[in-house]
Amino acid sequence: QYGAKCVFIKHETKPMSSSDIRDMLPNRRGASYLPESVYARIIKNGDYDAKPELYWLRDKAYAMLSPKRVAHVVGCEAEAVTLANRWGEDPENAAEAGILHDITKKLVLSDQLILCRKYGIINDNAEEENVKLLHAKTGAALARDLFNISDEVYDAIRWHTTGKPDMTLLEKIIYMADYIEPNRDFDGVDKLRKLAYENLDEAMALGLEMSLEDIRSYGQEPYYATADAYKWYSDHTAQKQ
């Protein structure tokens, strides 16, 4: 009647309501029902108490890594989940921290410092000159900005390089998973792996001691947080014996 030309497009629909999707989001589901940009914004803002689906989070994290680093992160996530199941930690939090712990590792010092200024990160003189120290702090801050991670996951990323005295269970799991994941190959790693599943605090003491010895073997002075962490875990485990 009006000269219109109608085109019928065949498209498979999914029976779904907005309330169904809102119910999915806190349970790490729903990404496939939303446009990528919408889902990313929901995760960033923490809308509807959303938690990121782990496959989606992996894609985002791996895009920020070198190919060699991806293999390490895959191993770290798997090790973190296994340790979490062994010691009674939430395996999804362990997976999330494992996936995200190195997202700024490939950035050069100048880019690390740009992120520090952006997120208001205060550093001491040693940190200002050391990418290895900075990436734990900038990685935690960037992960919180992009993915609205919990305080527990933030702290696990924040302390995964140096350690610190009296760490939470999740912090210890990520520190140890980073150290002993299957791609790691160094003298003593098998002993450390075994101990991590028998006595996590003793494994922390041994791992921190090995880290201090490695740093000193290069003629460098260990960062104070690592030395403090070793003293705490060494004293703590000695008191229990």
Where are these regions (language model features)?
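Classical nucleotidyltransferase
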Residues: 1-52
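Divalent metal-dependent catalytic cores for phosphoryl transfer on phosphate-bearing substrates
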Residues: 59-64, 72, 81-208
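Short helix/strand-capping connector loops at secondary-structure junctions
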Residues: 17-27, 190-191, 207-216
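Generic secondary-structure signature for well-ordered alpha-helical cores
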Residues: 26, 85, 162, 213-220
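Charged phosphate-binding loop/patch that engages nucleotide di/tri-phosphates or the phosphate backbone
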Residues: 30-54, 213-241
